[in-house]
Amino acid sequence: MCYCGCQRATAEEPTMDEPAELNKLRWRSRRGMRELDHLFDRYLSHRWAQASEAERGVFLRFLDCEDDKLWRWLMGYEVCQDASFAALIVTIRALPA
C-alpha cells in the first residue's frame, strides 16, 4: 500500500492507479503559494517516479511541515536542521524549471 492509502504496484508492475496516486499527491502538495505549488509540482513531475521509497517517505513527511517553514527552507532564507529534509531541498532546487 502506498503512503497516500492507495494500492501501489512495484516498478515492475505498473498499474492504472499510478496516475490517481499522483493526482492525490498533487492535491496534497497544494499550498496556495505559487512558489511552493510550482516547486512541488516540479518534484512530482520530474522526480517522484524514480525516487526511492525512502525519498518518497521524506517528501511525504516534508508536506506535513508548516507552509512558512517550507517556503523559508526552499527559498534559502533559513537552513533546515533535518538532514533528510535538507537533502530533499537540494534535490527540489536542482530540478529543471
UniProtKB/Swiss-Prot annotation:
The protein's location, in the record's own words, is: Cytoplasm
Q: Name one GO cellular component term.
A: cytoplasm
Primary location group: cytoplasm
Q: Does the keyword Cytoplasm apply?
A: yes
Question: Pfam families annotated for this entry?
Answer: Sdh5 (PF03937)
What this chain does, per the entry, is described as: An FAD assembly protein, which accelerates covalent attachment of the cofactor into other proteins. Plays an essential role in the assembly of succinate dehydrogenase (SDH, respiratory complex II), an enzyme complex that is a component of both the tricarboxylic acid cycle and the electron transport chain, and which couples the oxidation of succinate to fumarate with the reduction of ubiquinone (coenzyme Q) to ubiquinol. Required for flavinylation (covalent attachment of FAD) of the flavoprotein subunit SdhA of SDH and other flavinylated proteins as well.
Which PANTHER family does the protein's record reference? FAD ASSEMBLY FACTOR SDHE
What protein am I looking at?
Answer: FAD assembly factor SdhE
Organism source for this protein?
Xylella fastidiosa (strain 9a5c)
The UniProt gene name for this protein comes to sdhE
